[in-house]
């Protein structure tokens, strides 16, 4: 009898051990989920943790900064909505995927450059896109982009209040404030609509804080007693002395292409610059931060928080009076640099700081690597996994290539240009025969106020950067023809 009990007890212990081992193995091999929160036009330093705006409160964004990795030198390949979003999705440069300006006709060549979400679908993921897409203005089911099982979006910039939306091909008018609507849809999909047996990938891509920067009514009086602090490095004192003439013309108030006389140096503008609109942008961030907090809470309630890679970024930077500018597009730091925070406790230690230069085309390969999916050959970015682990990747890039194509809708914003940026230097070439280029020493002049392009002491550095530009253009197959894909699209439309 005693031996029988021992046998039974041994069997119970055996099966218990096997069961626990299987559970542990399952937890180790369980694929991570992905939550990608993308804000529109958020300056890299418009966050509470930066201290740039002492009154700014972003507790949930700050929590993400504490809990994961802050990629302090994260840049977009082109600083404008549509091109940057397409690059995030495809891992390719705008001159490759074809969306190199905000144009109502153009999508990426999806058949050649599938979004990372399509590869996740093939790997067993359930995927959703909630929010702005801002590519070709398509309607009905044509508006649904490849790679998503659930779709909730809108055409172009959309609207802040009571927006017209597209849900899985059905168009209707929603009621409320856009940030809240998108948050509710994302949470509804997480809790009620997805297959709980599958790993998921959710894009929550906000319209805010894009101009006209309309905050939620509950935040309209936020910070009303506060003053905008002057920018670091006194960049608001810009006079454009020694800088390209096209920038002085742009600032002076007429089309930079017009052959009109312009002073060699402009008077300093009084601070604050664009006070009302910039304060409203900061107010818009409150609803964004609340949204992030709500989704994080839902993930925690679902037991999926620590198994979800949370990514927070912006499609481009934004000028808040630096160099007297508003908007983005140009090759200044405030335009091309964006916040990038990533949390994944299984891999990333708390308070990780990454100094290396990373690009928006690096995100898609990184997501695929974490999901156990091989990077397709067309993706030009690199997995950031080694950096996220806290390692020192000796083979990581030493320079980046930035590009801008003159926008057909906003031609006065600036000419087509490229920039090469290293840890210390930046060269900007606007391809203008009758104007000068730009060269900045980012170590000694982080505000990019002193153009060194005509300084003989920097001739060797200038040539090195031009050689680097040539190398990068070959590496990334740079195509200066802005309209190559647009012409194909419009030609095909004429045939219909």
Label each region the model flagged:
Residues 23, 135, 145-150, 155, ...:
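C-terminal cap/loop subdomain of S1 sulfatases and analogous C-terminal strand-loop tails that border
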Residues 58-61, 86, 113, 117, ...:
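Extracytoplasmic/secreted envelope proteins and their assembly/folding machinery
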Residues 22, 36-39, 43-129, 138-139, ...:
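Active-site segment of extracytoplasmic enzymes that catalyze sulfate/phosphate-ester chemistry
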């Amino acid at each position: 009898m005693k031996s029988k009990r021992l046998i039974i007890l041994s069997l119970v212990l055996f099966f218990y051990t096997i069961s626990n081992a299987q559970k542990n193995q399952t937890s180790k091999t369980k694929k991570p989920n992905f939550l990608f929160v993308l804000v529109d036009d958020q300056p890299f330093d418009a966050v509470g943790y930066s201290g740039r705006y002492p009154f700014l409160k972003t507790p949930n964004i700050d929590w993400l900064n504490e809990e994961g990795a802050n990629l302090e030198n994260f840049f977009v390949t082109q600083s404008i909505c549509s091109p940057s979003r397409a690059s995030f999705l495809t891992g390719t440069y705008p001159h490759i995927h074809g969306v190199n300006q905000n144009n109502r006709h153009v999508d990426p060549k999806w058949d050649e450059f599938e979004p990372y979400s399509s590869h996740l679908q093939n790997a067993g993921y359930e995927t959703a896109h909630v929010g702005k897409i801002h590519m070709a203005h398509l309607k009905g089911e044509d508006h649904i982009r490849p790679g998503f099982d659930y779709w909730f979006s809108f055409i172009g910039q959309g609207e802040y209040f009571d927006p017209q939306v597209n849900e899985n091909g059905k168009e209707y008018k929603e009621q409320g404030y856009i940030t809240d609507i998108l948050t509710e849809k994302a949470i509804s999909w997480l809790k009620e609509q997805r297959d709980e047996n599958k790993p998921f990938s959710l894009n929550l891509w906000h319209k805010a804080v894009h101009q006209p920067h309309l905050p939620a009514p509950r935040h309209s009086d936020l910070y009303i007693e506060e003053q905008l602090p002057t920018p670091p490095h006194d960049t608001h004192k810009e006079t454009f002395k020694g800088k390209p003439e096209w920038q002085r013309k742009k600032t002076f108030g007429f089309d930079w292409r017009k052959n009109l006389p312009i002073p060699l140096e402009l008077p300093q503008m009084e601070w604050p610059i664009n006070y009302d609109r910039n304060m409203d942008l900061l107010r818009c961030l409150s609803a964004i931060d609340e949204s992030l907090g709500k989704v994080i809470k839902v993930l925690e309630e679902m037991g999926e928080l620590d198994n979800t890679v949370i990514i927070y970024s912006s499609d481009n930077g934004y000028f808040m009076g630096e160099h007297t500018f508003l908007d983005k597009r140009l090759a200044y730091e405030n335009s091309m640099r964006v916040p990038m925070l990533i949390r994944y406790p299984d891999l990333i230690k708390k308070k990780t700081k990454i100094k290396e230069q990373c690009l928006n085309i690096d995100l898609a390969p990184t997501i695929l690597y974490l999901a156990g999916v091989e990077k397709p050959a067309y993706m030009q970015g690199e997995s950031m996994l080694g950096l996220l682990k806290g390692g020192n990747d000796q083979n990581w890039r030493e320079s980046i290539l930035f590009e801008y194509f003159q926008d057909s809708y906003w031609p006065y914003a600036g000419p087509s240009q490229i920039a090469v940026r290293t840890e210390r230097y930046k060269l900007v070439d606007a391809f203008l025969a009758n104007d000068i280029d730009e060269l900045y020493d980012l170590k000694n002049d982080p505000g990019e106020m002193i153009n060194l392009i005509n300084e003989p002491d920097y001739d060797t550095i200038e040539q090195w950067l031009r050689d680097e530009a040539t190398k990068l253009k070959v590496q990334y197959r740079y195509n200066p023809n802005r309209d190559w894909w647009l012409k194909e699209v419009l030609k095909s439309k004429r045939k219909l």
